[in-house]
Amino acid sequence: MTDLFANPDHTLDALGLRCPEPVMMVRKTVRNMQPGETLLIVADDPATTRDIPGFCRFMEHELVASQTETLPYRYLLRKNQ
């Protein structure tokens, strides 16, 4: 079984940050990425379980994978056009 979270193009450590900081940091990081690149987000704010998927839907990026059963939460986002 392959680890979908292995070898992302970029990593964002949002541990210890609380809403709305994680999503603000994701937005800033994604702006500087090229289409098709991936971003691994590591967070421990329970609000990210709602905010990160919502951000991906709203901005039309792909949420490739998420792990929210245990801390820290992990999300893998792929930037679209």
Swiss-Prot record:
Alphabetized InterPro entries for the sequence: Sulphur_carrier_TusA, TusA-like, TusA-like_sf
The catalytic residues are: C19
Q: Which Gene3D superfamilies match?
A: TusA-like domain (3.30.110.40)
Q: Which UniProt keywords apply?
A: Cytoplasm, tRNA processing
Q: Which GO terms describe its biological process?
A: tRNA wobble position uridine thiolation
Tell me the route in metabolism or biology where this protein functions.
tRNA modification
Against SUPFAM superfamilies, the record matches this protein to: SirA-like
Can you supply one Gene Ontology CC term for this chain's record? Answer: cytoplasm
UniProt record similarity statement: Belongs to the sulfur carrier protein TusA family.
The protein's job, in short, is:
Sulfur carrier protein involved in sulfur trafficking in the cell. Part of a sulfur-relay system required for 2-thiolation during synthesis of 2-thiouridine of the modified wobble base 5-methylaminomethyl-2-thiouridine (mnm(5)s(2)U) in tRNA. Interacts with IscS and stimulates its cysteine desulfurase activity. Accepts an activated sulfur from IscS, which is then transferred to TusD, and thus determines the direction of sulfur flow from IscS to 2-thiouridine formation. Also appears to be involved in sulfur transfer for the biosynthesis of molybdopterin.
Its recorded name reads Sulfur carrier protein TusA
Q: Which species does this protein come from? A: Cronobacter sakazakii (strain ATCC BAA-894) (Enterobacter sakazakii)
From which lineage does this chain's organism come? Answer: Bacteria, Pseudomonadati, Pseudomonadota, Gammaproteobacteria, Enterobacterales
**Gene behind this chain?**
tusA
